Amino acid sequence: DYTSLLRKFCDDFERTGKIDYEGMRPYPSMLFGLETALFSVQASASGRNPHHLFENAFYEGRRPILTNGLVWMGNYDEMSKRIDEKLDNGFRCIKLKIGSIDFDSELSLLKKIRNRYGPSILEIRVDANGAFGYDEALVKLNRLSSFHLHSIEQPIPTGQWEKMGDLCKKSPVPIALDEELIGINNISIKSSLLDTIHPHYLVLKPSLHGGM
């Protein structure tokens, strides 16, 4: 089980002083956790704050990392309120989840939102979580393009590399891979995936993709 396997990897590290990258590659959350702990120990040993894993402007508090604020799909009033809250909190980029309600209704909401918040005020990204079928995806992407979107995450379900690659070539909205990357831990398979799909962006999650 997970706990026993994690214990084994920690015991191996304690015995050898080295991380078993090949053995841990199929378990990205464990690898991320162990690497983070190691960086923390190394920072402490060098006299730095153990929470400051690297020496750079971000950890020194001189430069932020820009992120997007997540806004779930709802009615227009709810979404406007959430967007206003994000803007008040300093966000200038939001990500909207789409694909959970009628597509025309989502387009209507996006139109109202974009009319209120122009591209110079708010950057909008959308995440379909694989909700589109391949045969309908390009039509939907063309309709979404009128809202000056930064990108769309995972328009179709995972495991369709050739079809996703075709969409990346033709889509007027840049495509980001998210779920497509999860579980792809072998380096040669990762390379093959990227060479086949040629995505515009990657959504990297250390605890899901393995390590720092």
Regions found by a protein language model. Give the residues of each.
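Catalytic domains of carbohydrate-active enzymes, especially glycoside hydrolases
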Residues: E85-K97
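Catalytic core of soluble alpha/beta enzymes
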Residues: I101-M212
